[in-house]
Amino acid sequence: MLNIQPTQSIVNNQPKSDQKKQKPADLLKEFYDKTGNRN
């Protein structure tokens, strides 16, 4: 459950239209690109 929560919070912060277009993996990639925490 713990590793689901960060992903869910990212999805919840996205507009509804973006949720339908993007998969959770895409949201994570976008999030890491924005924060610069991608390894």
Swiss-Prot record:
Highest taxon in the source lineage: Eukaryota
Compositional bias ranges of the Polar residues kind: 1-16
Chain positions covered by the region annotation Disordered: 1-39
Basic and acidic residues bias locations: 17-39
Name of protein: Uncharacterized protein DDB_G0281597
Organism, scientific name: Dictyostelium discoideum (Social amoeba)
